[in-house]
C-alpha cells in the first residue's frame, strides 16, 4: 500500500481501524462488531455501533394474530447477535485483519482513496443465518453501506430487516424525500411523494405503545441534531447527517426509542424520557394488516419471507 498524498488517513490501532479526513474521524471496531465512532465536524453521531435489526414493536394486529408467538425468535436475534468475521480492504485489496500484533507492520503514515470494512453477523435463530454489512469509506468522508441478509429455510416470517443507528442525543428534526405521513407496505396508497420536514421525534400515542413512524419509498433522509454529550462544545450548532438511497428507495423510522423499549411498555407513562435518536433504515417491512384485530394475518404479499435473500444499500454524507 503506497504512502501517497490522499485525503483519507488510515490508522491501524490494536482493536480499531481509524479513518481520518479534514472534517471527519471514523473508528471501526474489531470488538464491538461495527463502527463505534463517526465524528463529523467535531460532533459524534454514534452512541452504539450500528447493528442489523429484525424486530419491530408488535402492533395490535400482530398481537391479535399471534405473530409474536410465531416469530418471537427475531426479538432475541435483534437484541443479541454475534459478529462472526471482519474483513478489511484498502483500495480494493483485502489485507490480513490488522489487529495487534499484525498492525505493527504499518508505519502510521498510510493513506488510501477508499477503504471497505465488512462485518459478517450470525443470528441466534434456529436455524441460524448470516447478515453482512459492508462500509465503503471514500476520501471525501462519504460512506456507502451495503446490507445483505441470507435467506434460510425453516425461519419464520420477519417483522423488519434493516440497520439500526442509535445517536447520542435526540434529533431536533428530520427532513426526507418520500411519501407523506406514516406509511407501511399495505398502507401506502394515500401517501403523496414529496419533501417533508418532521419536528422532533414524534411517537404515535396508541393506547399501548407499538411500532409507528415508518416512512416507505424514501429517497433520502437527513437527521438534524444540536445537543451533544461533549462538554467542550458550549454552544453547539445544529448539524445534519444525510442517508441516501443507492439503487432503490428504502424505508425508515426515526424515534426516541428502540423497538424493545416500545415493546416493554404497556402505557406511554412507562416509556423513559427521550435521550437518544433511534434511526432504523429498512430494506423490508412487514405490513400492519387490519382485516380485523383478533386473528387475521397480514396478507401474504406484505409479509417478509425469511427464506429469501434481502439486500439494500445507502450512502451516508454530510
Swiss-Prot record:
Any single biological process term in GO: lactose catabolic process
Catalytic activity: Hydrolysis of terminal non-reducing beta-D-galactose residues in beta-D-galactosides
Molecular functions (GO terms): beta-galactosidase activity; carbohydrate binding
Pfam families referenced in this protein's UniProt entry, alphabetically: Bgal_small_N
A cellular component annotation (GO) from this entry: beta-galactosidase complex
The entry's keywords: Glycosidase, Hydrolase
Known EC number: 3.2.1.23
Function summary: Component of a beta-galactosidase.
Sequence similarity: Belongs to the bacterial beta-galactosidase small subunit family.
Assembly behavior: Heterodimer of a large (LacL) and a small subunit (LacM).
PANTHER family in UniProt: BETA-GALACTOSIDASE
Protein name in UniProt: Beta-galactosidase small subunit
